Amino acid sequence: MYARLDAILPSSVDREDAESNLNAGEIEYAITALLDDAYTSVGLSDAVVGLIRENYDDGPVIDMLDALLYYQSVKAV
């Protein structure tokens, strides 16, 4: 899942924290870190949101996605 998300994000998205979590075996935290870095760098595209929603129903990844989407909607107002 991490590799699929990583592949659809632009190279400008920082991956240092995400890769650190990935190397530590913390896959979900790697994905949440990658989502956070994507949000702060380029925003969350429909492709990113769709990929996460297709693969997760609950847990830290969905919690992070929902929080970032909330902040993105507030920022857009």
Residue positions per predicted region:
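C-terminal-biased regions
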Residues: 1-77
